[in-house]
Every structure is written in structure tokens, then in C-alpha cells.
Amino acid sequence: MKFLFSVILVIISFLGISKIVNGQIACPSPFLYRATNDTVGDYDLGYQYINIGKPLPPQLSFLNNCLMPCQSSFFEQDSWNSFNKLVKQMGAVAFTCSAIIMIIYGPLMNRSFFKFDRHTITVFCFALSTFFIGVSDLMFATNDVDMVCPESHRYARQTDKTCATNGVLFQFGWLGSVMWFAFLSIDGFFRASGKKMNKIAFAIVLASIWILNIVLSFAPMGGDQYGAYFVGQVNCWILVKNWQYAFFWAELIVSLAIGFVGICLTIYSLIRKTSDGNTLKHVTPLILVFLLFCQYLYMIIFYGIINEKKDHYQNILAEQVGCIFNNALAKMKVPGIVYAGECTFNETITFSSQYAFLFFVRLLGIEIFAFYLFSKETLLLIKSSYIATMFGLGDKDAYDVELEETD
């Protein structure tokens, strides 16, 4: 962690920096001292202490009251700038891509939408979900870091401006994409095998997914769970890992299981129909579902590691800062302080793993666009759309005829 080397330079430049600066207790830059006896209450307000995690000599006891900066010291500022830039730029692209697919597959252009066409509605719902992720990213782009860091050393909480809204939008979009990915895999199997689904059954599935998504997105507000996490996310999201497991990761695990079954059944159906001239057109959606499966799998592995090792990562950072200051005070011959030897710098979260996580979440909206925009199905939807037929450029039955022939 290169950040810690900058701490060393600060210490050296100030000859070990005293804990008293102009009569005020000071912490090493970029940390900030906060006098408190209620660290738990402060956490609820958004303050994150470095938490040395072990008894300290009196001369160093002030370090337990040092606040972590927002955004956190797990990454250098250049790294955070890269993360923020990725979310802003890629989020805007994903928002636009999702909106285009929503328009084509939604009721504005899709004549089959209100006929409860299973496939087009499923694609629309997935695009709608990634659209909400894009909206949350645009909120971050508009408000910048102030949305997650209302103060230099305080992380946003649900009571802060825009954080609750951003958290709900992100959760709603991300969770929705997960559940509709699962159904997209089942839809692929139905299309590849030629099986049909009762429209009433599909209506029940449609309503159930959206109702469940709404409940799981708004319920965390009852526990004041939305806020800025000091690692993993750039947006506001669910703070406590047990709440994350209950309201997101459990649903993702179930969706991955369904997705895996759907992928296997689709492959099996395609193998059985290798002589069918329509087999190739089912391969592209299968590739999309497989890529989504891999991305969601990476997300759960990454966040699982983060959640399980969060306290460990904090302790590494805290111990390294404590070691540096201990040695600095020892060199100043402060009574009672013993030189602790060379301070080691252990890796916590790599830049590439964090970047990949943020990238994969934003890639969802771009993928649905890339895989469906130029498909034959999309071209038929455009040809049969209200707008195309209004100007005499299309055939209102084009998509339905294709559907009858192949589905």
C-alpha cells in the first residue's frame, strides 16, 4: 500500500510528528483526530476509526481516535480517482445503452409487449434493471464524491442528502438484474427447446420478481442500512454484511444456481437440435447468459472475501500506522517507547480486483445492448414498431410472423 509510504514521509518531514500541534491533538495526515467515547455511535453517523486493535502505550493512545479519510486509505487517491472516473463514464454509457434497449423492447415500440411476449418482456426487464444502476451512477457523477463523503472524514449515511435514494436505486437495479438474469437463462432454454410457457404463469413470475425486488430494496431502509461503504463500492449501498447476505447475496446465489441450470438445459437442447437450421440464433443469447453468470460469480467471490476480511484489512492498516508512529517516537527517545523493528507492509485489496468488480457491474447494461441491438429479433421489432409503420417503413406483423415460425 503505497499510501503508507506517504505517511512515513510525513513523519520524517516532521521528525516523528508530535501528537500535539498548536495545542490540538493531531493524527498523521490524512487521518483526523476526533475526541469521542462512543465509537459505535460515531460509526452510525459515518465516522470510521482506524482501530489499532491492541493495547497502546499512553503516548500512542490517541491513535485509536484517528478517523479514516473518505474515500478510504485502502487505496491511494489516484486509485480512487480511477474508480470514480470508471463509474461516472462507464455508468453514463451503460445508462444510454440500457435506455435504447428499453425503448425498443418496451411498450413504446414493441407491439408484442402487451401480448405478454415472454422473451421481449424479459429482455426489457433486464435492461430496466441496468437502467436503474445507470441512474444511480449518474447521481454520483452529478454530486461527485460529496454524495458518499459529505465531510472529508465522514462517510455518507441514509440520513444524508441523496445517499438513501442512491442506495435504493443501486440495490433495486443490481438485484433486479440478478433475478432477471436467472429468468433470461430459463427463457433461453424455452426458446432453444421450443417449449412454451403459460402466459398466466409468466404473469405470476413477472409480478413476483418485481414485488420481491421492491421489498428487498426498501426493507433495508427500516434498519438504516444504506450508506457509503469504505471499500468495495463507490455508490451508497447496504452497510452491514448480514443485511447484505439477507437482501442481496442470498438472492444472487439462488439466481446463479437457476442460471447454471438454465445454461446446462439450453446447451443440452442445442446439442439435440444440431441439425436444426435455427440452432445458431440461440447461441448468441447463450453466450450472453454465460458471460453474465461469470460476472456475477466474480462479484460474489470478491465481495465475500471483502466482507470476511474487512476487519483484518482494517487491522493491517491500523497496525502499520501504529508501528510507524511507535518507531518515530522511539527515535525521538520518548520515554516508555521501544523501537519495534522494521514495519512490514502487507497487501490488502488489490487495485485490479476492485477495478474489475466496478467494471463488471457497469458492463451489464452495455452487454445487453451489444448482444441484442443488431440481432434479427431487434430489427424485426423495429420494423413492426408503431413508429416504423406510422411512416410506412415497416410491417406491423413482422415480429409476430417470425415468432410463430420459430418459437
UniProtKB/Swiss-Prot annotation:
Species of origin reads Dictyostelium discoideum (Social amoeba)
Domain of life where this protein originates: Eukaryota
Query: Where located?
Result: Membrane
Its membrane topology, per UniProt?
Multi-pass membrane protein
Question: Mind telling me which residue stretches traverse the membrane in this protein?
Answer: 90-110, 121-141, 170-190, 200-220, 247-267, 286-306, 355-375
* Gene label: fscJ
Q: Which Gene3D superfamilies match?
A: Rhodopsin 7-helix transmembrane proteins
Query: What protein name is recorded for this chain?
Result: Frizzled/smoothened-like sans CRD protein J
Q: Name one GO cellular component term.
A: membrane
